[in-house]
Amino acid sequence: MKLYYTTFKSPVGEILATRTENVLNFITFPKSTWQRFFSALKKDENIDLKKDEKKFSSLKKTFKPYFAGKKVKFKESLDLTGGTPFQKRVWKTMLKIPYGQTKSYGWLARQVGGKNKARAVGYACGANPIPIVIPCHRVIREDGGLGGYGGGLSIKRKLLKIEGAKI
C-alpha cells in the first residue's frame, strides 16, 4: 500500500500527516512522537512510504486560516478503519462539535448511546488518529476541566484558545 506523508510547522509544533491516495488517515504532533510512528511503519513490508507535499496542499491551505483563528471546514475524506465500531461513533460525533465550542465527555457518551460511558469516550478520544480535524480537543470534563489530550494539555488549551472557546 502506498502511504504519503508531509510535515509542516504550526503554532502547536511540527505536524506529521499521512494519507493514502484518497483519504487522510493520520495526524500526529508533537515531533517527539514521530520516531515511534516511523519505526512502526518500517516493520510493515506492505507499506511504501513516500513524502509528497502536493497531496497535502488542500489540508495545509485549510490549516493556515485555522491556526490564524478563523473557522474552517476540513474537506478531507477520512480513513477511520482502524477504530472499533464504538470509537468510530465517537469520532464521527466529535466532527459535529462546532468550532469554538466544547462538549463534555458525558455529553459525548450520551450522544453515542451510553450515558455511563464517559470513560470509554475518553479512551476513544485518546485513540483519535486525526486530531484537530476530528476535534477531540473540544471535549472536556463535565466540571469544565480540560481532561486529557494526547498532545498534552498545553496544546489542548492552545487549540481551544485559537478557536476562541471559553475555558
Give residue spans per PLM region.
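Major-groove recognition helix of helix-turn-helix-like DNA-binding domains
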Residues: M94, V121-A127
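Histidine- and aromatic-rich ligand-binding microenvironments
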Residues: P98, P129-I132
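…primarily DNA-binding HTH/wHTH and HhH modules…
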Residues: E142-I167
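Basic nucleic-acid-binding alpha-helical/helix-turn surface characteristic of O6-alkylguanine DNA
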Residues: M1-G114, I162, K166-I167
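Short Lys/Arg-enriched helix C-cap and helix-to-coil transition segments
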Residues: I132-V139
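Helix-turn-helix DNA-binding helix
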Residues: G114, A118-V121
